[in-house]
C-alpha cells in the first residue's frame, strides 16, 4: 500500500466524521461493484476506529433485473456475508433495502410489449426505468438519513459531469472543502466519501480486506484482479461499443454479447420500426416482426449459453412470471393480461401494441426474418472476430 493512500483514506474518514458524525443510522448505496464494495467496507473501518458500534447500517441495492447474472449473484451473496461480518466482528446491525423495476418497466416488457428500441445517448429510457425510478423509491424508504455513494471522479466522464452539474465542485484543491463530497437531492442527503479515490486506491484497499472476508476473492475474479478497467451493468446495454464483461466471464457469455449487438442492429433498421407521423423522430417502436425476433433471440441465447435471464423469473404480474406471460401460458390468457395492464396506453396508442401470437410465432414474419438474417450475416463480416461466430450462430438458430 503506497503512502498516498493514507491521505485519501483520511480525507474519507473526515467526510464521514462531518456527515455521519454522531448519527445512529446511515445508508450505503450498494451496486455490488468494486467501488460500492470498497465504500461499504470503509464504513466498517470508520466504525471501528471511531468506536461507533451503535451505528445502524442499511445497504440499499437496486436490482435492475438486467444485470450480468454473475454480478447480481455476487451482490446478493456479499450482502449476507457483509451483514454477518459486521455483526460478529464490528458489532453493528446491518439491514437491506432491495428494489427492482416494476414488471412493466423491465427490459423484457418494454421491448416485447411496447416495442422499445435499443437506447441511445439521447434516449436513455433504460436508465430512467431500470435504475432511477427504483432508486427514488428506495431513497423514500431510507428517509432523511445520509446515503453514502461510491461515485468517483476517476470513473466515466458522464458521472463526473453529473456531479459537477449538481454543484459538487470545490474552488480549492480536492479534499480542501466539504462541498466536493456532498449534495442535497430533494429530501435526501447524498455523500460521496471516496470521490477523490483512484482505481488503484480501490483495489489496494480491497486487498487489505481479502484476508478478513474470503468471499472478496470472487469480486477480484470478476474484475480480472483489477488488471482491466471493467465496468459491470446491464447485459443488454447498447450505450457501450463492447460489453467487456461478456468477454472475460467465459465463452458462454459471448452469446449474450451477440444478442446485445443484434438488438442494436435490429433497432437501427428503418424497416423494422413502425413509422410515426409526429415527434422528433419519425421512427417509432419495433415492428411485430422485430419483437418476434427479439423473443426468439432471448430463447435461443438461453439455450446456447446455458445462462438464464433471471429477470424473466423474478418479476411477476398477477401471479405469472414474465417468462410464463411471454412464452408459456395460452395466448388468450397472455393477451387478456397485457390488455388489462396496458389498457390506458392501448387506448391512447393502439398502433404500438400487437397480440402475443405475433411475438411468439416468428413464422408469421418469414420475409422480414430472412431479410434480417441476410443483413446480419453480411454485417457480421466486419465485427470483432472473437464474437463474429457467436453472432452468426445465434442469428441462424433463430430460423432453425
Cite the ranges covered by each PLM segment.
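ATP-dependent adenylation/nucleotidyltransferase module used to activate substrates
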Residues: 1-200, 206, 395-400
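ATP/NTP-dependent adenylation/nucleotidyl-transfer catalytic domains that generate, transfer
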Residues: 17, 24, 208-400
Amino acid at each position: 500500500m503506497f503512502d498516498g493512500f493514507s491521505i485519501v483514506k483520511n480525507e474519507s474518514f473526515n467526510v464521514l466524521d462531518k456527515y455521519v458524525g454522531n448519527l445512529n443510522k446511515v445508508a450505503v448505496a450498494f451496486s455490488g461493484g468494486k467501488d460500492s464494495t470498497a465504500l461499504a467496507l470503509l464504513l466498517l473501518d470508520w466504525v471501528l476506529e471511531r468506536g461507533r458500534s451503535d451505528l445502524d447500517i442499511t445497504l440499499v441495492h437496486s436490482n435492475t433485473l438486467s444485470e450480468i447474472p454473475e454480478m447480481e449473484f455476487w451482490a446478493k451473496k456479499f450482502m449476507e456475508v457483509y451483514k454477518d461480518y459486521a455483526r460478529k466482528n464490528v458489532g453493528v446491525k446491518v439491514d437491506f433495502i432491495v428494489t427492482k423495476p416494476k414488471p412493466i418497466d423491465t427490459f423484457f416488457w418494454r421491448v416485447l410489449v411496447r416495442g422499445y428500441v435499443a437506447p441511445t445517448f439521447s434516449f436513455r429510457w433504460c436508465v430512467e426505468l431500470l435504475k432511477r425510478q427504483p432508486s427514488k423509491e428506495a431513497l423514500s424508504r431510507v428517509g432523511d438519513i445520509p446515503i453514502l455513494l461510491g461515485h468517483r471522479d476517476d470513473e466515466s466522464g458522464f458521472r463526473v459531469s453529473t456531479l459537477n452539474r449538481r454543484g459538487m465542485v470545490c474552488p480549492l484543491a480536492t479534499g480542501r472543502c466539504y462541498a466536493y463530497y456532498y449534495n442535497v437531492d430533494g429530501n435526501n442527503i447524498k455523500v460521496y466519501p471516496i470521490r477523490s479515490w483512484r482505481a488503484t486506491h480501490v483495489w489496494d484497499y480491497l486487498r487489505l480486506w481479502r484476508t478478513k472476508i474470503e468471499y472478496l476473492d470472487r469480486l477480484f475474479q470478476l474484475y480480472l484482479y483489477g488488471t482491466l478497467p471493467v465496468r459491470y451493468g446491464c447485459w443488454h446495454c447498447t450505450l457501450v461499443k463492447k460489453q467487456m464483461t461478456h468477454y472475460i466471464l467465459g465463452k458462454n457469455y459471448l452469446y449474450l454479447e451477440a444478442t446485445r449487438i443484434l438488438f442494436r442492429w435490429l433497432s437501427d433498421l428503418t424497416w423494422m420500426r413502425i413509422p410515426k407521423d409526429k415527434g422528433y423522430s419519425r421512427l417509432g417502436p419495433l415492428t411485430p416482426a422485430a419483437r418476434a425476433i427479439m423473443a426468439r433471440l432471448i430463447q435461443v441465447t438461453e439455450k446456447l449459453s446455458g445462462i438464464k435471464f433471471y429477470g424473466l423469473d423474478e418479476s411477476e404480474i398477477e401471479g405469472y412470471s414474465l417468462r410464463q406471460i411471454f412464452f408459456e401460458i395460452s395466448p388468450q390468457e397472455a393477451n387478456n393480461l397485457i390488455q388489462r395492464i396496458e389498457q390506458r396506453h392501448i387506448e391512447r396508442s393502439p398502433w404500438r401494441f400487437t397480440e402475443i401470437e405475433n411475438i411468439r410465432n416468428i413464422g408469421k414474419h418469414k420475409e422480414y426474418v430472412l431479410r434480417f438474417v441476410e443483413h446480419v450475416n453480411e454485417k457480421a463480416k466486419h465485427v470483432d472476430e472473437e464474437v463474429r461466430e457467436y453472432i452468426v450462430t445465434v442469428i441462424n438458430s433463430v430460423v432453425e
